Amino acid sequence: MTTPELPEGDIPTNWGRWGADDQFGTLNFITDAVRARAVAAATAGRVVSLAFPVTPVPLAGPVPFGASPAPAAVLQVLSYNGSPARAITDVLLLNTHHVGMTHIDALVHLPAGDQVYPGIPLSTAVSLGRVTHGSTAAFAAGITTRGVFLDLAPGDQLDSGHEVTGRDLDEAEARAGSRVESGDALVVRAGWRVSHELTEAVPAMTLDAVLWMADREVSVYAGDIGDRPPVPPGGPMIMHQVALPLLGMPLIDGPDVSALAATCTELGRHDFLFVVAPMAVTGATGLPVNPLAIF
């Protein structure tokens, strides 16, 4: 596997910004003051989930690994204990980065060449089958911050192949009436559901849009678009290539933002308390999540 080439040009990084061994990246922008401001945004008592439901598929044969060949994001083996059963248990096999799973990417997920954030050699971060730097350990305390929702195509969807720029984000921000500030989570809607069945070119974030997020000091990104699925494999994945290894910005892939869009329209506001509390699993490259927007 080779890492796709980054576009030419001066791309800023956060390497060294919070120390040579930092593992939190842009989550460092979430200060106590940011959390307090976020909690103050929860005034109506409404809770909206940003996760797609996943139905497990019974495991009945060899396990195909990778994002594409797996029959589902979750495979399940049920265990009936006794007859009559005193308890029913199961084992779940999670294909974390499956396109059908709402999940968060750890910073180690995509390296820049032979380094991961913030300049740690890949051979040091991942060795002997274990991830020791840049893993999901950074999410053990959860993510609590203010979220801002930007709808790039209210009531519609972006055109196929649209390349999202900072100007698109500026215009969506003006419509929302809520400014993205340091430490905020950015949630974006383009009106698409990425899947392996899609034959059209999915809209995608450009480098300009990612640099917009860096300039605003976004702590975490969640959107129904991000990178266009690379065809052929090895093609550019600008958002993942810049956000994860260079900026140290965690990405939430595959969220369901439809109910959030409807709620923002109903309440006439686009900011909320944003909470993500993944399992406290260390040493993984990502985890399934159920992000919550609390109004």
What is each PLM-predicted segment?
Residues 1-295:
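Active-/binding-site microenvironments in catalytic and ligand-binding cores
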